Amino acid sequence: SIDYRIGTRYMGEFISDSYKLAAMKTPYLSELLKSDSIYIESNITFDNLAPLSNYLGKPGNIELGGIPIAEYEKRQEQHRKAEVAALLDTGYFASRSKEIYQYNNFICDSGGSICEVVNPEDPNDPVMNHLSENTLLVWIKGSDAHTEALINRFDKNPKPMCYEESFLAKKWEEFI
């Protein structure tokens, strides 16, 4: 899972640091954290990407659980870079699965943000080239009902997503 790789390898420190910043606002926890008496870490798993989604946050009113748009944009850029890096790890994981586990087949769950970080029309796109050299790319085209089910699932349990900067700016302007 690319999202798991993003949340552990590439954004794990950002996530943990956000927890530590929150803990430092509580004197009791701050004292324990500064004396290395407690350890704060996310418990991200293949089935639970909530730490990553929670860190990415939602732009909006802080009193309602939102974060300032500038902070959201910063986190989106972190996520975009992490998405690219994790996708470029695919070849390494494919060869590793063969070498260590003797798996003849490797499935890369690229995640929903792949469309935001690649240009399939560009023959020199580094991510698309890497993926096409190491995998067979499969596009699963969903129906309108599938799209509706994904939207409903996203509302209940948001998946980590990165958005193209121009799209995000346009949607933010429409929102405010």
Model-derived segments and spans:
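Short beta-strand-centered segment that lines the nucleotide-binding/catalytic pocket of NTP-utilizing
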Residues: 1-10
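Short, surface-exposed, charge-dense and proline/glycine-enriched linear segments
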Residues: 27-38, 135-142, 171-173
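ATP-dependent small-molecule kinase phosphotransfer cores
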Residues: 10-120
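Noncatalytic linker/hinge segments flanking ATPase motor cores
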Residues: 38-47, 146-155, 176
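Conserved phosphate-donor/acceptor-positioning beta-strand/loop module used by diverse small-molecule
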Residues: 109, 124-171
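Switch/connector loops and helix/strand junctions flanking conserved nucleotide-binding motifs
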Residues: 8-9, 115-116, 145-151
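Compositionally biased, low-complexity repeat tracts
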Residues: 3, 53, 138-140
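A solvent-exposed, charged loop/short amphipathic helix patch at secondary-structure junctions
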Residues: 60-73, 155-176
